[in-house]
Amino acid sequence: MSPLAQIFALPVRAYRLLLSPWVGHGCRYQPTCSVYALEALERHGALKGGWLAARRILRCHPWGGSGYDPVPGADPEHDRRPRG
Protein backbone atom coordinates (compact mmCIF):
# COMPACT_ATOMS: atom_id res chain seq x y z
CA MET A 1 0.00 0.00 0.00
CA SER A 2 1.36 3.42 -0.91
CA PRO A 3 2.15 5.92 1.86
CA LEU A 4 -0.81 8.10 0.84
CA ALA A 5 -3.14 5.08 0.85
CA GLN A 6 -1.88 4.22 4.34
CA ILE A 7 -2.80 7.72 5.49
CA PHE A 8 -6.26 7.35 3.91
CA ALA A 9 -6.64 4.00 5.71
CA LEU A 10 -6.02 5.52 9.18
CA PRO A 11 -9.60 6.79 9.70
CA VAL A 12 -10.99 3.42 8.57
CA ARG A 13 -8.74 1.55 10.99
CA ALA A 14 -9.64 3.98 13.78
CA TYR A 15 -13.34 3.43 13.07
CA ARG A 16 -12.89 -0.35 13.17
CA LEU A 17 -10.95 -0.16 16.44
CA LEU A 18 -12.91 2.51 18.32
CA LEU A 19 -16.44 2.85 16.94
CA SER A 20 -17.34 -0.42 15.25
CA PRO A 21 -17.51 -2.44 18.49
CA TRP A 22 -20.04 0.06 19.89
CA VAL A 23 -22.09 0.60 16.74
CA GLY A 24 -22.45 -3.07 15.90
CA HIS A 25 -22.76 -4.86 12.59
CA GLY A 26 -25.04 -2.57 10.63
CA CYS A 27 -23.49 -2.62 7.17
CA ARG A 28 -25.95 -3.54 4.42
CA TYR A 29 -23.25 -4.88 2.12
CA GLN A 30 -20.87 -7.81 2.08
CA PRO A 31 -17.96 -7.26 2.51
CA THR A 32 -18.56 -4.55 5.09
CA CYS A 33 -17.81 -0.95 4.13
CA SER A 34 -14.63 -0.82 6.25
CA VAL A 35 -13.28 -4.05 4.72
CA TYR A 36 -14.24 -2.73 1.26
CA ALA A 37 -12.43 0.57 1.91
CA LEU A 38 -9.22 -1.10 3.06
CA GLU A 39 -9.28 -3.53 0.13
CA ALA A 40 -9.97 -0.73 -2.37
CA LEU A 41 -7.04 1.29 -0.99
CA GLU A 42 -4.80 -1.79 -1.12
CA ARG A 43 -5.75 -2.75 -4.70
CA HIS A 44 -6.21 0.64 -6.36
CA GLY A 45 -4.14 3.12 -4.33
CA ALA A 46 -5.14 6.30 -2.56
CA LEU A 47 -6.99 8.19 -5.29
CA LYS A 48 -9.06 5.52 -7.03
CA GLY A 49 -9.35 3.40 -3.87
CA GLY A 50 -10.40 6.44 -1.85
CA TRP A 51 -12.99 7.33 -4.50
CA LEU A 52 -14.38 3.77 -4.52
CA ALA A 53 -14.53 3.72 -0.71
CA ALA A 54 -16.29 7.11 -0.55
CA ARG A 55 -18.88 6.03 -3.15
CA ARG A 56 -19.52 2.81 -1.24
CA ILE A 57 -19.95 4.59 2.10
CA LEU A 58 -22.39 7.05 0.49
CA ARG A 59 -24.44 4.12 -0.87
CA CYS A 60 -24.65 2.44 2.55
CA HIS A 61 -27.85 3.88 4.00
CA PRO A 62 -31.35 2.56 4.75
CA TRP A 63 -32.68 3.54 1.30
CA GLY A 64 -29.65 2.25 -0.62
CA GLY A 65 -28.85 -1.17 -1.96
CA SER A 66 -27.59 -4.22 -0.12
CA GLY A 67 -25.99 -7.57 -0.79
CA TYR A 68 -22.69 -8.77 -2.20
CA ASP A 69 -20.63 -5.89 -3.61
CA PRO A 70 -16.89 -6.62 -3.91
CA VAL A 71 -14.19 -4.14 -4.87
CA PRO A 72 -13.97 -3.85 -8.69
CA GLY A 73 -11.05 -5.88 -9.92
CA ALA A 74 -11.25 -8.27 -6.98
CA ASP A 75 -13.66 -10.69 -8.68
CA PRO A 76 -13.40 -10.99 -12.49
CA GLU A 77 -16.89 -12.54 -12.67
CA HIS A 78 -18.32 -9.48 -10.85
CA ASP A 79 -16.62 -7.08 -13.27
CA ARG A 80 -18.21 -8.78 -16.31
CA ARG A 81 -21.70 -8.79 -14.84
CA PRO A 82 -23.89 -5.98 -16.23
CA ARG A 83 -25.13 -3.47 -13.69
CA GLY A 84 -28.73 -2.50 -13.77
From Swiss-Prot:
Q: Extract the ranges annotated as region (Disordered).
A: 63-84
Q: Where is this gene product found?
A: Cell inner membrane
The record's listing under NCBIfam families reads: membrane protein insertion efficiency factor YidD
Q: How does it sit in the membrane?
A: Peripheral membrane protein
Q: Which UniProt keywords apply?
A: Cell inner membrane, Cell membrane, Membrane
Tree of life domain:
Bacteria
Pfam (any one): YidD
Role according to the record: Could be involved in insertion of integral membrane proteins into the membrane.
UniProt organism field: Cereibacter sphaeroides (strain ATCC 17025 / ATH 2.4.3) (Rhodobacter sphaeroides)
What name is this protein filed under? Putative membrane protein insertion efficiency factor
Might you report a single GO cellular component term? plasma membrane
Where is this chain compositionally biased, Basic and acidic residues type?
Answer: 75-84
Question: Which family is it part of?
Answer: Belongs to the UPF0161 family.
